[in-house]
């Protein structure tokens, strides 16, 4: 019994001197584990008489309980001390103002597309979408683009094979629409297009919005009026606009549209023209009965002009300092 008393006293002293939870766990194993000092005392039961065993067993159990209770109290005390220290270290000044959540904003290119869609939507134009991986019929042949036209060159177009490529314009959407729907038609087709070019004013991927109107007696005067109104609406000022004769395989006559910049120079903003009869024939529309006009504009170019951005590549570099200016 004297030995048991000494072991308990030693255990309680070690518990009192322990400075962390790991030390306390080591003490628990050392005294109360399967091979612990107090647990081993039970082995002495075999050498005791029947009269001595009950008293000895009770003493060992009381010793275990005393050490376990002291351990539990010490563990609770250390945990409380650690929590208090942590709370002091992480003290929060509740008088400080809260942090506001920073909300995102629409990308300037998205803003431009939505602005274009809104204007033409009010004129009855429907938004149409199409595949970005296109075949040569919808990207070139149906648009009256000859086999040897420079637009088909490998250095301008991203080909998967000689018959399949990343679309170079959204005109394929117009072709697909005319294949499946009968006139009258009024559509615009915004989307990503791809060309092998990269500099201050070009990127390999950029956005276009093309428009198409096909019906009876559509004429160039209607085209001019709509585009003139669009440009004044988009730039929110009474711009000086001119239509300059040009050439596109898919329209005849064709024109490029310029606006007068604030520096007194003409700036090209889009191309347009009357749909070529060959394009109408390629989709089964009688050019003797129907006529139409088409136009196409680079979204990034319009965005650059509207917001005064000099380098097109800035739109796609994900620099928040730049993008936050358009919130």
UniProtKB/Swiss-Prot annotation:
Disulfide bonds: none annotated. It catalyses: tRNA(Phe) + L-phenylalanine + ATP = L-phenylalanyl-tRNA(Phe) + AMP + diphosphate + H(+). It comes from the Bacteria. Mg(2+) binds at residue 252. GO terms for molecular function: ATP binding; magnesium ion binding; phenylalanine-tRNA ligase activity; tRNA binding. The keyword Mitochondrion does not apply. Binds 2 magnesium ions per tetramer. CDD domains: PheRS_alpha_core (cd00496). InterPro entries: aa-tRNA-synth_II, aa-tRNA-synth_II/BPL/LPL, Phe-tRNA-synth_IIc_asu, Phe-tRNA_ligase_II_N, Phe_tRNA_ligase_alpha1_bac, Phenylalanyl-tRNA_Synthase, tRNA-bd_arm. Its cofactor is Mg(2+). Keywords: Aminoacyl-tRNA synthetase, ATP-binding, Cytoplasm, Ligase, Magnesium, Metal-binding, Nucleotide-binding, Protein biosynthesis. Its EC number is 6.1.1.20. It is found in: Cytoplasm. It holds the Pfam family tRNA-synt_2d. One of its GO terms (biological process) is phenylalanyl-tRNA aminoacylation. NCBIfam families: pheS. Belongs to the class-II aminoacyl-tRNA synthetase family. Phe-tRNA synthetase alpha subunit type 1 subfamily. Tetramer of two alpha and two beta subunits. This is Phenylalanine--tRNA ligase alpha subunit. It comes from Shewanella denitrificans (strain OS217 / ATCC BAA-1090 / DSM 15013).
């Amino acid at each position: 019994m004297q030995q048991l008393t000494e072991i308990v006293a030693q255990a309680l002293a070690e518990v009192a001197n322990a400075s962390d939870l790991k030390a306390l766990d080591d003490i628990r194993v050392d005294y109360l584990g399967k091979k612990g000092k107090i647990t081993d005392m039970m082995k002495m039961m075999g050498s005791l008489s029947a009269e001595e065993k009950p008293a000895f067993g009770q003493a060992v159990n009381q010793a275990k309980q005393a050490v376990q209770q002291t351990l539990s109290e010490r563990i609770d005390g250390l945990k409380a001390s650690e929590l208090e220290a942590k709370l002091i270290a992480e003290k929060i000044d509740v008088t400080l103002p809260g942090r506001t959540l920073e909300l995102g904003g629409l990308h300037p290119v998205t803003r431009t597309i939505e602005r274009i869609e809104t204007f033409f939507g009010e004129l009855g134009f429907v938004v149409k979408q199409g595949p970005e991986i296109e075949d040569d019929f919808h990207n070139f042949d149906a648009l009256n683009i000859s086999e040897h036209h420079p637009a088909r060159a490998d250095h301008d177009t991203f080909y998967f094979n000689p018959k399949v490529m990343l679309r170079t314009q959204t005109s394929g959407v117009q072709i697909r629409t005319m294949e499946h729907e009968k006139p009258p038609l009024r559509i615009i087709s915004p989307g990503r297009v791809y060309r092998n070019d990269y500099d201050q004013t070009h990127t390999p991927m950029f956005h276009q919005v093309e428009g198409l109107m096909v019906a009876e007696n559509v004429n160039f005067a209607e085209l001019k009026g709509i585009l003139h109104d669009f440009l004044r609406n988009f730039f929110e000022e009474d711009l000086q606009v001119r239509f300059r004769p040009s050439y596109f395989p898919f329209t005849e006559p064709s024109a490029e549209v310029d606006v007068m910049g604030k520096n007194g120079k003409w700036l090209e903003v889009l191309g347009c023209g009357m749909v070529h009869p060959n394009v109408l024939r390629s989709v089964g529309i009688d050019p003797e009965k129907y006529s139409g006009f088409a136009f196409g504009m680079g979204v990034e170019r319009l965005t650059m002009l509207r917001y005064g951005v000099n380098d097109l590549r800035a739109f796609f570099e994900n620099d928040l300092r730049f993008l936050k200016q358009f919130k």
